Amino acid sequence: MASRPGALTEWPWSPLGSFKYLLVAPLVMASMHSYVTAVDEEKDLSRLMIVVLMLWRIVHSQIWISVSRQRTAKGTNKIVDKPIEFEQVDRERTWDDQVIFNTLLMYLANIKLPGASHLPPWRLDGAILMALLHAGPVEFLYYWFHRALHHHFLYSRYHSHHHSSIVTEPITSVVHPFAEHIAYTLLFAIPMVTASLCGILSIVSIMGYITYIDFMNNMGHCNFELFPKRLFHLFPPLKFLCYTPSFHSLHHTQFRTNYSLFMPIYDFIYGTTDNLTDSLYERSLEIEEESPDVIHLTHLTTHNSIYQMRLGFPSLSSCPLWSRPPWYLTCFMWPFTLLCSFALTSAIPLRTFVFERNRLRDLTVHSHLLPKFSFHYKSQRHHESINTIIEEAILEADEKGVKVMSLGLMNNREELNGSGEMYVQKYPKLKIRLVDGSSMAATVVINNIPKEATEIVFRGNLTKVASAVVFALCQKGVKVVVLREEEHSKLIKSGVDKNLVLSTSNSYYSPKVWLVGDGIENEEQMKAKEGTLFVPFSHFPPNKLRKDCFYQSTPAMRVPKSAQNIDSCENWLGRRVMSAWKIGGIVHALEGWEEHDCGNTCNVLRLHAIWEAALRHDFQPLPPSPL
């Protein structure tokens, strides 16, 4: 928000939240009904295309969001290398308000404005007139209006809201107070209203003009340079007719230069072109892909997780992954969800790609996505292809000089690759160190269990983490109750020889601390006493069936305050909370440990040292749950 918010700062429908799209629903239904029921001579395709344009604008902007976030995480041609935090994401989450506003006005114009209904598909004279009006009056008026917005009175009340984002994302371009958008809409309406009054407006010219505005806005704020030098060498006047991302980026860092809308000619005419324009452009083109110190390899979970990942919807990725997806994803977007899921996992070459970049002290940490869902990992027939992708990612990272790769979620399954041991045995000369994160996860779980607990129930699949936790607890004198004979036998074989109790009696459901993981059944949860604390040791959280019980987070810690560029949530974890498996790789690199930390067994003797190292680097335990 602006430093001193003026009148008409907030959008009128702000209280509606995500239900704001209901404002256009009656108009959409009415236009569809009239088109279907009207006779051929009275059908108005132009009115029907308004909703198509609205949907296209949202998809178009989302494409820019995803591409920009991936490119800036990768680092190639990046312009401003500063962090984006949750504060900016929250401020920009209403970027689609202007789409709703424009849609409502277009419906009104279609009904009331002469020449704005029953439009032909295409008219060349109308398109030429609109192009000339944009290059002339629109660009000229915008330039001077923009300069006026930088006067202290208007800047402090309105435009400072937009300039709160020093590092821009595509959607930053449309994050303005409501009053500013009224002015911008009047400006951009000049070509369309004039063509309409002249009777030469067409469907293609409207859609093309608005798409041009959105494209240029998004491109100018994408924070990576994409114009090749040869383009300006082939056509030198282009420098005055089309701005570049680096050109507008200077406006956000210098404030008093580069005011033009899309055509820099007005800055050249009035002497407000920044002196660094050419040098920043050339320097941005020379920036190569960044080589990180640590790579964390993860994957998608559910189909709807494509929206919650960092390259998805910013408003969703900045919040923990939901147990129940939002109503609009389930009801309206499932075809798009399936299409995107198919494209990610089948239609494009399968390889990992970077989607997030964090800074922690002197470390650069990249998160890479393996484009597979959780259900792929549970199918034996997908194991070979998944291992091939992981293997290629390890070798590529090793070649680039990456220090550590941590295997997140199901990439470190024992059934898949022996918790990473398979790659170490196959490539014994690897310089990169593989960390499956199990040691860090185990020590986090151990320290999450209340100190006063003397007896706990163990229930879930017996994994490497679970075995290490049970062993350590038994060594500390905590009685661990196991409910299945098979799990009891495996734990005995692994070296647990005291404080381990096997019982199938209902009386042994009474301890108020349960150590749980994948495999716990809903019926078993219901047998726990009121007030029981469930402590997960697995990647995935248990179903929260009991409102009278407490559920801890999956193994995780809060990141140091010095950690930068954290603008999204890691799956179901909260803001600035990181999974233990990812922390394991980071701590391994910070400590400079030379050995791999992966394989079928966990070195229990090192757990305390790993915990102390995490605390030493300012990772903080999550607040304890009551017992």
From Swiss-Prot:
The keyword Mitochondrion does not apply. Residues 138-272 form the Fatty acid hydroxylase domain. Keywords: Membrane, Transmembrane, Transmembrane helix. One of its GO terms (cellular component) is membrane. Expressed in flowers and siliques. Not detected in pollen, pedicels and seeds. The chain crosses the membrane at residues 19-39, 48-68, 126-146, 186-206, 328-348. It holds the Pfam family FA_hydroxylase. One of its GO terms (biological process) is lipid biosynthetic process. It is found in: Membrane. One of its GO terms (molecular function) is iron ion binding. It is a multi-pass membrane protein. Belongs to the sterol desaturase family. This is Protein CER1-like 1. It comes from Arabidopsis thaliana.
